[in-house]
Protein backbone atom coordinates (compact mmCIF):
# COMPACT_ATOMS: atom_id res chain seq x y z
CA UNK A 1 0.00 0.00 0.00
CA UNK A 2 2.77 2.39 0.98
CA UNK A 3 4.68 1.46 -2.15
CA UNK A 4 1.64 2.13 -4.30
CA UNK A 5 1.15 5.55 -2.73
CA UNK A 6 4.80 6.33 -3.33
CA UNK A 7 4.47 5.44 -6.96
CA UNK A 8 1.38 7.62 -7.33
CA UNK A 9 3.09 10.53 -5.58
CA UNK A 10 6.14 10.20 -7.81
CA UNK A 11 3.95 10.19 -10.89
CA UNK A 12 2.15 13.32 -9.73
CA UNK A 13 5.44 15.09 -9.10
CA UNK A 14 6.66 14.03 -12.52
CA UNK A 15 3.45 15.32 -14.12
CA UNK A 16 3.72 18.62 -12.30
CA UNK A 17 7.32 18.95 -13.44
CA UNK A 18 6.34 18.19 -17.03
CA UNK A 19 3.50 20.69 -16.81
CA UNK A 20 5.85 23.34 -15.49
CA UNK A 21 8.42 22.67 -18.17
CA UNK A 22 5.72 22.67 -20.86
CA UNK A 23 4.26 25.94 -19.63
CA UNK A 24 7.69 27.55 -19.45
CA UNK A 25 8.48 26.32 -22.96
CA UNK A 26 5.13 27.53 -24.24
CA UNK A 27 5.63 30.92 -22.62
CA UNK A 28 9.07 31.21 -24.20
CA UNK A 29 7.66 30.24 -27.58
CA UNK A 30 4.84 32.77 -27.25
CA UNK A 31 7.30 35.48 -26.27
CA UNK A 32 9.52 34.57 -29.21
CA UNK A 33 6.58 34.73 -31.62
CA UNK A 34 5.43 38.00 -30.08
CA UNK A 35 8.85 39.51 -30.68
CA UNK A 36 8.84 38.25 -34.26
CA UNK A 37 5.32 39.60 -34.80
CA UNK A 38 6.38 42.94 -33.39
CA UNK A 39 9.26 42.97 -35.86
CA UNK A 40 6.95 42.08 -38.72
CA UNK A 41 4.50 44.75 -37.59
CA UNK A 42 7.29 47.31 -37.63
CA UNK A 43 8.30 46.19 -41.12
CA UNK A 44 4.70 46.24 -42.32
CA UNK A 45 4.26 49.72 -40.88
CA UNK A 46 7.20 50.87 -42.96
CA UNK A 47 5.80 49.15 -46.05
CA UNK A 48 2.38 50.64 -45.37
CA UNK A 49 3.90 54.11 -45.26
CA UNK A 50 5.62 53.45 -48.60
CA UNK A 51 2.41 52.08 -50.13
CA UNK A 52 0.47 55.10 -48.86
CA UNK A 53 2.98 57.41 -50.54
CA UNK A 54 2.85 55.41 -53.77
CA UNK A 55 -0.95 55.64 -53.72
CA UNK A 56 -0.53 59.39 -53.99
CA UNK A 57 1.17 58.95 -57.37
CA UNK A 58 -0.86 58.21 -60.49
CA UNK A 59 0.93 57.20 -63.67
CA UNK A 60 -0.82 57.32 -67.04
CA UNK A 61 0.15 57.80 -70.64
CA UNK A 62 -0.27 56.76 -74.24
CA UNK A 63 1.63 55.89 -77.40
CA UNK A 64 0.47 56.72 -80.91
CA UNK A 65 2.27 54.78 -83.65
CA UNK A 66 1.12 55.38 -87.19
CA UNK A 67 1.65 54.85 -90.89
CA UNK A 68 1.23 57.90 -93.12
CA UNK A 69 0.79 58.24 -96.88
CA UNK A 70 1.48 61.68 -98.36
CA UNK A 71 -0.59 62.12 -101.51
CA UNK A 72 1.28 65.30 -102.35
CA UNK A 73 2.40 66.43 -105.80
CA UNK A 74 4.22 69.45 -107.16
CA UNK A 75 2.34 71.60 -109.65
CA UNK A 76 4.13 70.07 -112.65
CA UNK A 77 3.60 66.51 -111.41
CA UNK A 78 7.31 65.71 -111.20
CA UNK A 79 7.65 65.48 -107.40
CA UNK A 80 5.54 63.14 -105.27
CA UNK A 81 5.68 63.33 -101.49
CA UNK A 82 6.94 65.72 -98.85
CA UNK A 83 10.52 66.89 -98.18
CA UNK A 84 12.60 64.75 -95.84
CA UNK A 85 14.06 66.98 -93.15
CA UNK A 86 17.75 67.70 -93.65
CA UNK A 87 17.91 66.16 -97.13
CA UNK A 88 16.96 66.97 -100.72
CA UNK A 89 14.84 63.83 -101.10
CA UNK A 90 11.08 63.33 -100.83
CA UNK A 91 8.98 60.61 -99.24
CA UNK A 92 5.41 59.58 -99.96
CA UNK A 93 4.94 57.23 -96.98
CA UNK A 94 6.46 56.60 -93.58
CA UNK A 95 6.01 54.89 -90.25
CA UNK A 96 5.98 57.46 -87.49
CA UNK A 97 5.79 57.74 -83.69
CA UNK A 98 3.40 60.66 -83.38
CA UNK A 99 3.20 60.85 -79.60
CA UNK A 100 4.71 58.89 -76.71
CA UNK A 101 3.77 60.47 -73.41
CA UNK A 102 3.80 59.49 -69.78
CA UNK A 103 2.05 61.59 -67.16
CA UNK A 104 2.88 61.61 -63.45
CA UNK A 105 0.33 63.10 -61.06
CA UNK A 106 1.30 63.39 -57.40
CA UNK A 107 -1.29 64.30 -54.77
CA UNK A 108 0.58 64.87 -51.48
CA UNK A 109 -2.44 66.24 -49.63
CA UNK A 110 -6.06 66.86 -50.42
CA UNK A 111 -6.42 69.77 -52.82
CA UNK A 112 -2.87 69.78 -54.17
CA UNK A 113 -1.68 68.17 -57.42
CA UNK A 114 1.77 68.11 -58.98
CA UNK A 115 1.74 67.16 -62.68
CA UNK A 116 4.68 66.27 -64.91
CA UNK A 117 4.26 65.04 -68.50
CA UNK A 118 7.20 64.60 -70.89
CA UNK A 119 6.80 63.66 -74.55
CA UNK A 120 9.32 61.21 -75.99
CA UNK A 121 10.40 61.59 -79.60
CA UNK A 122 13.01 59.69 -81.57
CA UNK A 123 15.41 62.63 -81.57
CA UNK A 124 14.47 64.48 -78.38
CA UNK A 125 12.45 64.58 -75.17
CA UNK A 126 10.28 67.66 -74.67
CA UNK A 127 8.25 68.86 -71.72
CA UNK A 128 4.50 69.04 -72.34
CA UNK A 129 3.07 69.70 -68.87
CA UNK A 130 4.71 70.72 -65.61
CA UNK A 131 2.49 72.52 -63.12
CA UNK A 132 1.25 72.72 -59.57
CA UNK A 133 -2.52 72.78 -59.11
CA UNK A 134 -3.89 74.18 -55.84
CA UNK A 135 -7.59 73.49 -55.33
CA UNK A 136 -9.80 75.53 -53.05
CA UNK A 137 -10.76 73.26 -50.11
CA UNK A 138 -13.19 75.70 -48.54
CA UNK A 139 -15.57 76.68 -51.34
CA UNK A 140 -14.67 73.82 -53.71
CA UNK A 141 -14.85 76.37 -56.51
CA UNK A 142 -11.43 77.83 -57.32
CA UNK A 143 -8.17 76.30 -58.47
CA UNK A 144 -4.81 77.90 -59.17
CA UNK A 145 -2.40 76.49 -61.76
CA UNK A 146 1.25 77.55 -61.90
CA UNK A 147 3.74 76.27 -64.47
CA UNK A 148 3.34 74.98 -68.02
CA UNK A 149 -0.16 73.88 -69.05
CA UNK A 150 -2.74 73.94 -71.85
CA UNK A 151 -4.02 77.26 -73.10
CA UNK A 152 -7.73 77.49 -72.24
CA UNK A 153 -9.70 76.69 -75.41
CA UNK A 154 -11.91 73.68 -76.06
CA UNK A 155 -9.92 72.07 -78.86
CA UNK A 156 -6.64 72.48 -77.00
CA UNK A 157 -7.91 71.09 -73.70
CA UNK A 158 -9.52 68.11 -75.45
CA UNK A 159 -6.78 65.48 -75.13
CA UNK A 160 -5.03 64.10 -78.20
CA UNK A 161 -5.66 60.63 -76.77
CA UNK A 162 -9.44 61.18 -76.90
CA UNK A 163 -9.75 63.31 -80.03
CA UNK A 164 -11.68 61.79 -82.95
CA UNK A 165 -9.23 63.10 -85.56
CA UNK A 166 -5.50 62.60 -86.05
CA UNK A 167 -4.63 66.28 -85.56
CA UNK A 168 -6.13 69.55 -84.39
CA UNK A 169 -7.38 72.09 -86.92
CA UNK A 170 -5.07 74.36 -88.89
CA UNK A 171 -6.64 77.35 -87.11
CA UNK A 172 -5.67 76.11 -83.65
CA UNK A 173 -2.23 74.86 -84.69
CA UNK A 174 -1.42 78.25 -86.20
CA UNK A 175 -2.83 80.62 -83.59
CA UNK A 176 -1.82 78.54 -80.53
CA UNK A 177 1.35 76.63 -81.52
CA UNK A 178 2.17 73.55 -79.39
CA UNK A 179 -1.02 74.25 -77.38
CA UNK A 180 0.83 75.00 -74.12
CA UNK A 181 2.28 78.09 -72.50
CA UNK A 182 3.94 79.04 -69.23
CA UNK A 183 2.30 81.20 -66.62
CA UNK A 184 -0.44 81.18 -64.02
CA UNK A 185 -4.11 80.31 -64.42
CA UNK A 186 -7.10 80.76 -62.13
CA UNK A 187 -10.19 78.62 -62.66
CA UNK A 188 -13.63 78.93 -61.07
CA UNK A 189 -16.09 76.04 -61.44
CA UNK A 190 -19.44 76.89 -59.86
CA UNK A 191 -21.08 73.52 -60.57
CA UNK A 192 -19.67 71.57 -57.61
CA UNK A 193 -20.60 73.90 -54.76
CA UNK A 194 -23.46 75.94 -56.17
CA UNK A 195 -24.92 73.59 -58.80
CA UNK A 196 -24.53 76.41 -61.33
CA UNK A 197 -22.97 75.06 -64.58
CA UNK A 198 -20.54 77.90 -65.25
CA UNK A 199 -16.77 77.61 -65.58
CA UNK A 200 -14.42 80.60 -65.86
CA UNK A 201 -10.70 80.61 -66.64
CA UNK A 202 -8.20 83.48 -66.62
CA UNK A 203 -4.52 82.99 -67.47
CA UNK A 204 -1.47 85.27 -67.55
CA UNK A 205 1.12 83.80 -69.92
CA UNK A 206 4.57 84.44 -71.32
CA UNK A 207 2.98 84.31 -74.75
CA UNK A 208 5.96 82.96 -76.69
CA UNK A 209 5.71 79.20 -76.14
CA UNK A 210 5.79 77.26 -79.40
CA UNK A 211 7.66 80.09 -81.11
CA UNK A 212 11.36 80.06 -81.92
CA UNK A 213 13.85 77.47 -80.70
CA UNK A 214 13.24 75.35 -77.59
CA UNK A 215 15.87 77.40 -75.77
CA UNK A 216 13.96 80.60 -76.58
CA UNK A 217 10.74 79.11 -75.19
CA UNK A 218 12.23 78.34 -71.78
CA UNK A 219 11.59 81.92 -70.64
CA UNK A 220 9.80 85.03 -71.85
CA UNK A 221 11.73 86.90 -74.53
CA UNK A 222 10.12 90.34 -74.26
CA UNK A 223 9.10 90.80 -70.57
CA UNK A 224 5.49 91.51 -71.59
CA UNK A 225 2.74 89.09 -70.56
CA UNK A 226 -0.32 87.98 -72.49
CA UNK A 227 -3.81 87.56 -71.06
CA UNK A 228 -6.21 84.78 -71.94
CA UNK A 229 -9.75 84.24 -70.62
CA UNK A 230 -12.53 81.72 -71.25
CA UNK A 231 -16.04 81.09 -69.99
CA UNK A 232 -18.25 78.02 -70.58
CA UNK A 233 -21.90 77.49 -69.62
CA UNK A 234 -23.56 74.05 -69.76
CA UNK A 235 -27.22 73.12 -70.09
CA UNK A 236 -29.05 69.79 -70.20
CA UNK A 237 -32.40 69.12 -71.82
CA UNK A 238 -34.72 66.28 -72.86
CA UNK A 239 -34.37 64.41 -69.57
CA UNK A 240 -30.60 64.95 -69.63
CA UNK A 241 -30.25 63.10 -72.96
CA UNK A 242 -29.16 66.34 -74.67
CA UNK A 243 -26.25 68.35 -73.31
CA UNK A 244 -25.05 71.66 -74.74
CA UNK A 245 -21.92 73.58 -73.76
CA UNK A 246 -21.36 77.03 -75.17
CA UNK A 247 -18.74 79.59 -74.37
CA UNK A 248 -16.27 82.22 -75.49
CA UNK A 249 -12.61 83.05 -75.09
CA UNK A 250 -10.22 85.89 -75.79
CA UNK A 251 -6.48 86.24 -76.18
CA UNK A 252 -4.92 89.67 -75.59
CA UNK A 253 -1.22 89.84 -76.34
CA UNK A 254 1.53 91.39 -78.41
CA UNK A 255 4.49 90.44 -80.58
CA UNK A 256 7.40 92.61 -79.47
CA UNK A 257 10.08 93.51 -81.99
CA UNK A 258 13.17 92.49 -80.02
CA UNK A 259 15.73 93.06 -82.79
CA UNK A 260 16.19 94.72 -86.16
CA UNK A 261 18.53 94.06 -89.02
CA UNK A 262 20.78 96.27 -91.14
CA UNK A 263 19.24 97.36 -93.42
CA UNK A 264 16.04 97.23 -91.35
CA UNK A 265 13.50 94.46 -91.95
CA UNK A 266 10.31 95.65 -93.63
CA UNK A 267 7.02 94.39 -92.17
CA UNK A 268 3.55 94.32 -93.74
CA UNK A 269 0.46 95.69 -91.94
CA UNK A 270 -3.15 94.45 -92.04
CA UNK A 271 -3.73 96.30 -95.32
CA UNK A 272 -0.59 94.78 -96.85
CA UNK A 273 1.21 98.13 -96.67
CA UNK A 274 4.93 98.08 -95.79
CA UNK A 275 6.28 99.64 -92.60
CA UNK A 276 9.50 99.48 -90.60
CA UNK A 277 9.02 98.88 -86.86
CA UNK A 278 11.55 99.94 -84.26
CA UNK A 279 13.02 97.69 -81.60
CA UNK A 280 10.54 97.66 -78.73
CA UNK A 281 7.46 98.20 -80.90
CA UNK A 282 4.60 95.91 -79.94
CA UNK A 283 2.41 94.43 -82.68
CA UNK A 284 -1.16 93.38 -81.96
CA UNK A 285 -2.08 89.78 -81.23
CA UNK A 286 -5.74 89.94 -80.16
CA UNK A 287 -8.20 87.10 -80.72
CA UNK A 288 -11.88 86.58 -79.86
CA UNK A 289 -13.69 83.28 -80.19
CA UNK A 290 -16.87 81.37 -79.51
CA UNK A 291 -17.52 77.65 -79.06
CA UNK A 292 -20.39 75.17 -78.98
CA UNK A 293 -20.55 71.45 -78.18
CA UNK A 294 -23.77 69.44 -78.30
CA UNK A 295 -24.08 65.83 -77.14
CA UNK A 296 -27.20 63.79 -77.83
CA UNK A 297 -27.78 60.28 -76.52
CA UNK A 298 -29.56 59.03 -79.63
CA UNK A 299 -28.94 55.77 -81.50
CA UNK A 300 -25.71 55.12 -79.65
CA UNK A 301 -24.74 58.75 -79.18
CA UNK A 302 -23.67 61.63 -81.40
CA UNK A 303 -22.01 65.00 -80.97
CA UNK A 304 -21.71 68.26 -82.87
CA UNK A 305 -18.82 70.60 -82.05
CA UNK A 306 -17.60 73.92 -83.37
CA UNK A 307 -15.37 76.91 -82.66
CA UNK A 308 -14.94 80.30 -84.30
CA UNK A 309 -11.99 82.68 -83.84
CA UNK A 310 -11.42 86.11 -85.34
CA UNK A 311 -8.97 88.91 -84.62
CA UNK A 312 -5.56 90.38 -85.35
CA UNK A 313 -2.41 88.28 -85.38
CA UNK A 314 1.24 89.21 -85.82
CA UNK A 315 4.44 87.37 -86.50
CA UNK A 316 8.13 87.74 -87.21
CA UNK A 317 10.89 85.69 -88.78
CA UNK A 318 13.22 86.43 -85.87
CA UNK A 319 14.69 83.05 -84.89
CA UNK A 320 13.77 83.58 -81.23
CA UNK A 321 10.08 84.25 -81.98
CA UNK A 322 9.16 82.63 -85.29
CA UNK A 323 5.90 80.68 -85.55
CA UNK A 324 6.52 78.02 -88.21
CA UNK A 325 2.90 78.25 -89.45
CA UNK A 326 2.87 82.08 -89.48
CA UNK A 327 6.40 82.58 -90.73
CA UNK A 328 6.49 86.18 -91.94
CA UNK A 329 7.08 89.74 -90.75
CA UNK A 330 3.49 90.85 -90.80
CA UNK A 331 0.27 91.83 -89.04
CA UNK A 332 -2.91 90.27 -90.35
CA UNK A 333 -6.63 90.14 -89.70
CA UNK A 334 -7.34 86.43 -89.33
CA UNK A 335 -10.45 84.28 -89.15
CA UNK A 336 -11.10 80.59 -88.68
CA UNK A 337 -13.68 78.06 -87.60
CA UNK A 338 -14.48 74.37 -87.62
CA UNK A 339 -17.54 72.15 -87.40
CA UNK A 340 -17.25 68.46 -86.55
CA UNK A 341 -19.82 65.70 -86.39
CA UNK A 342 -19.15 62.46 -84.48
CA UNK A 343 -21.41 59.39 -84.44
CA UNK A 344 -21.00 56.18 -82.48
CA UNK A 345 -21.56 53.08 -84.65
CA UNK A 346 -22.44 50.29 -82.28
CA UNK A 347 -20.34 49.97 -79.15
CA UNK A 348 -16.83 49.85 -80.62
CA UNK A 349 -16.84 52.09 -83.71
CA UNK A 350 -16.98 55.85 -84.25
CA UNK A 351 -17.33 57.76 -87.52
CA UNK A 352 -16.29 61.42 -87.67
CA UNK A 353 -16.24 64.23 -90.21
CA UNK A 354 -14.84 67.73 -89.79
CA UNK A 355 -14.82 70.85 -91.94
CA UNK A 356 -12.39 73.56 -90.87
CA UNK A 357 -11.44 76.90 -92.39
CA UNK A 358 -8.53 79.22 -91.69
CA UNK A 359 -7.96 82.53 -93.45
CA UNK A 360 -4.65 84.15 -92.43
CA UNK A 361 -5.50 87.37 -94.29
CA UNK A 362 -9.16 88.36 -94.46
CA UNK A 363 -8.41 91.62 -96.31
CA UNK A 364 -6.99 89.95 -99.40
CA UNK A 365 -8.18 87.17 -101.68
CA UNK A 366 -7.60 85.57 -105.04
CA UNK A 367 -4.94 86.97 -107.36
CA UNK A 368 -4.30 89.92 -105.05
CA UNK A 369 -2.39 87.49 -102.82
CA UNK A 370 1.31 87.29 -103.68
CA UNK A 371 2.48 85.15 -100.75
CA UNK A 372 1.31 81.58 -100.09
CA UNK A 373 1.18 82.34 -96.37
CA UNK A 374 -1.86 84.58 -96.98
CA UNK A 375 -3.95 81.91 -98.72
CA UNK A 376 -7.17 80.68 -97.14
CA UNK A 377 -7.56 76.94 -96.52
CA UNK A 378 -10.77 74.89 -96.40
CA UNK A 379 -10.04 71.43 -95.04
CA UNK A 380 -12.10 68.24 -94.98
CA UNK A 381 -11.16 65.49 -92.52
CA UNK A 382 -12.72 62.03 -92.34
CA UNK A 383 -11.95 59.53 -89.59
CA UNK A 384 -13.00 56.10 -88.34
CA UNK A 385 -12.10 54.69 -84.93
CA UNK A 386 -12.29 51.09 -83.75
CA UNK A 387 -11.97 50.50 -80.01
CA UNK A 388 -10.32 47.12 -79.47
CA UNK A 389 -10.78 47.53 -75.71
CA UNK A 390 -10.57 50.30 -73.14
CA UNK A 391 -6.84 50.73 -73.75
CA UNK A 392 -6.29 50.15 -77.46
CA UNK A 393 -7.91 51.82 -80.45
CA UNK A 394 -7.28 51.95 -84.19
CA UNK A 395 -7.85 55.06 -86.30
CA UNK A 396 -7.99 55.68 -90.02
CA UNK A 397 -7.96 59.38 -90.97
CA UNK A 398 -7.91 61.18 -94.31
CA UNK A 399 -7.27 64.93 -94.61
CA UNK A 400 -8.07 66.94 -97.75
CA UNK A 401 -6.71 70.51 -97.59
CA UNK A 402 -8.17 72.84 -100.25
CA UNK A 403 -6.20 76.04 -100.71
CA UNK A 404 -7.39 79.35 -102.09
CA UNK A 405 -6.05 79.82 -105.64
CA UNK A 406 -3.90 82.72 -106.79
CA UNK A 407 -1.97 83.28 -110.00
CA UNK A 408 0.65 85.27 -108.08
CA UNK A 409 1.47 83.13 -105.01
CA UNK A 410 3.65 80.51 -106.70
CA UNK A 411 3.19 77.77 -109.29
CA UNK A 412 1.84 75.25 -106.76
CA UNK A 413 -1.10 77.49 -105.85
CA UNK A 414 -2.46 78.47 -109.23
CA UNK A 415 -4.72 75.47 -108.68
CA UNK A 416 -5.60 73.49 -105.57
CA UNK A 417 -2.29 71.94 -104.51
CA UNK A 418 -2.60 68.18 -104.23
CA UNK A 419 -1.51 67.60 -100.61
CA UNK A 420 -3.81 65.04 -99.00
CA UNK A 421 -2.66 62.83 -96.11
CA UNK A 422 -3.86 59.38 -95.04
CA UNK A 423 -3.06 58.18 -91.51
CA UNK A 424 -3.47 54.72 -90.02
CA UNK A 425 -2.83 54.87 -86.28
CA UNK A 426 -2.63 52.47 -83.36
CA UNK A 427 -3.00 54.01 -79.91
CA UNK A 428 -2.29 52.27 -76.63
CA UNK A 429 -3.00 54.05 -73.37
CA UNK A 430 -2.60 53.10 -69.74
Give the ranges of each region predicted by the language model:
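Outer-membrane beta-barrel pore domains
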Residues: 27, 88-89, 131-134, 148, ...
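Active-site-proximal beta-alpha loop/turn segments in soluble metabolic enzymes
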Residues: 203-218, 268-275
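Outer membrane beta-barrel
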Residues: 50-74, 84-210, 221-241, 250-252, ...
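Bacterial N-terminal signal peptides
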Residues: 1-6
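Short, solvent-exposed loop/turn segments at secondary-structure boundaries
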Residues: 117, 214-219, 411-414
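A short secondary-structure junction signal
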Residues: 197-198, 211-217, 258-261
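Interfacial loop-to-helix transition and helix-capping segments at the boundaries
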Residues: 218-222, 285
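N-terminal periplasmic/intermembrane-space "pro-region" immediately following the signal or transit peptide
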Residues: 8-64, 73
Amino acid sequence: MISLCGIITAQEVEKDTVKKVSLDSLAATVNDHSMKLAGYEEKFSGLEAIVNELNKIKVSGYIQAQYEMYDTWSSDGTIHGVPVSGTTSYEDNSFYIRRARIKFTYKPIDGVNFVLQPNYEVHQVTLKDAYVQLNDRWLNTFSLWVGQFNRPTYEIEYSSASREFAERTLMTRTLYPTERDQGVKLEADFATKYNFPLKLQVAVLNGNFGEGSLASQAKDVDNAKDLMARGVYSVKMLSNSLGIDFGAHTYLGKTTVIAQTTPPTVFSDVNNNPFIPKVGDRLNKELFGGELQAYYDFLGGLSLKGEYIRGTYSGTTNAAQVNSLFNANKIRNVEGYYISFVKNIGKVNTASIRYDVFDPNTKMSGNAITNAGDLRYNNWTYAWQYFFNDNIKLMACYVMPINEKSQNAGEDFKIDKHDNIFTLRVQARF
